[in-house]
Amino acid sequence: MQNSHSGVNQLGGVFVNGRPLPDSTRQKIVELAHSGARPCDISRILQVSNGCVSKILGRYYETGSIRPRAIGGSKPRVATPEVVSKIAQYKRECPSIFAWEIRDRLLSEGVCTNDNIPSVSSINRVLRNLASEKQQMGADGMYDKLRMLNGQTGTWGTRPGWYPGTSVPGQPAQDGCPQQEGGGENTNSISSNGEDSDEAQMRLQLKRKLQRNRTSFTQEQIEALEKEFERTHYPDVFARERLAAKIDLPEARIQVWFSNRRAKWRREEKLRNQRRQASNTPSHIPISSSFSTSVYQPIPQPTTPGSMLGRTDTALTNTYSALPPMPSFTMANNLPMQPPVPSQTSSYSCMLPTSPSVNGRSYDTYTPPHMQTHMNSQPMGTSGTTSTGLISPGVSVPVQVPGSEPDMSQYWPRLQ
C-alpha cells in the first residue's frame, strides 16, 4: 500500500485516493472501539481521519459489518419500484408521516433489509417526486378542461349565419361547408398558438398557488392550541396526538405550530426584557449627592479670629488679627465642583491637624496690589514662604506650603 499510495492525510497516515481502507485497519478500529477508546483517540493512534473512523463505526453499529460498500458508483439502486410504491402507500395512509418513520416501517414489515434500506434523504427525494407527479397530473387535468373549452369555442365560430357571406340556415349550403370547415381549422390553428401561451401562464399561476399553500386554523383550533401552549411549551407525542384528535388536525401540523409558537414567544420575551432594561436604566446621569450644598453659600467673615477653625491658638490670633476684613462672595462661578475630602466636616472646614501645638508658626498670604498699603503697616510673620494658585481671574488661593514639622503639612486655604 505504501508503494502505491497517492497522499498523506493530516495525521501522517497514507491512503489511496478513492479506495477503501484495508480490512486490517478496519478491524483495528472496531477492536479499539470495543476496548473503550474514543473515536478521536482511534484517529490519532491509527492515523486515520476522524470522519473515516466515525463512518466505519457507524456502519458497524448499524449493520454489524466492517466491509466497505460498493465503490465508484456501482451501488445498487435501493429505491426500486416496489419500495417506491410502498412509500407512496404509507404516505397516502398517513400524509403527515416522517421519512424516518417510513424507513422504520420498511424494515419492520420486511420490505427492505439493513443492506438495501434507503436512507432518509432518499425517502424524502421519493416523496418530493411523488408530490411533483401528483401536481403535474392535477395540472394536466385542468389543462384538458381548458383545451376542451377552447375547442368548443372554435367549433362555435363555424356555425352558419355568424359571419357575413354564409348561407341562410333554411337553405342547403353544400358548397360553403368545405370553406367553413377549412376556416374552422384555421381558427383552431391560430387559437392553438395563443393556447400555448395561456397554458404557460396558467402553469405559472398554478405553481405560485401551490407554493403558497399554507395551513389555516379556525378560531377553535387556535384557542385549543394556545391553551395547550400555556400548559407546556413542549408537548410530548401523546399530548400532540390527543390534541390532533380533538381539533381534527394532523399531528405533524401541531408539531410545526408549536415550533413556530415557541419562536414567537422567544421574540416577545426578548422585546420584554429590552423594555424592562430600558425602563430600569435612567435616561441621564444624575449629579452625585455627595457634593456639599454649602459650596454655593457665601462665606461669612469670622467675628473672632480662629472661630472658623474651632481653635483659639495664640499664633493664629496673631496671624489673622492683622488681616483686613474680607468681603463675602459666592463660589458658584469660581470653584469647580469636586468631591469633598473624607476628613472634612464641611466644604470649607479646617484642614489643620488636630494637634494643639502650633509652635507659634504663621504663614504669609498673598496680598493684592490695591491692599498692599494697608498690609505694610501691620506686623506679619516671616517664617514661611507661599505660592498662589489661580482658580479664575481675580481670585487667588494660597497653595499649601510644607513646613519643617509634620503636623503643619496642611492649613486652611484663605481666599482673597
From Swiss-Prot:
Provide the residue span(s) of the region labelled RED subdomain.
Answer: 82-130
Going by the UniProt record, its keywords in alphabetical order are: Developmental protein, DNA-binding, Homeobox, Nucleus, Paired box, Transcription, Transcription regulation
Gene Ontology cellular-component terms for this entry are: nucleus
- The record's DNA-binding region positions are 4-130, 210-269
Secreted as UniProt keyword: no
So where does this one cross the membrane? none
| Function, in words | May be a transcription factor with important functions in eye and nasal development.
- Name of this chain's protein: Paired box protein Pax-6
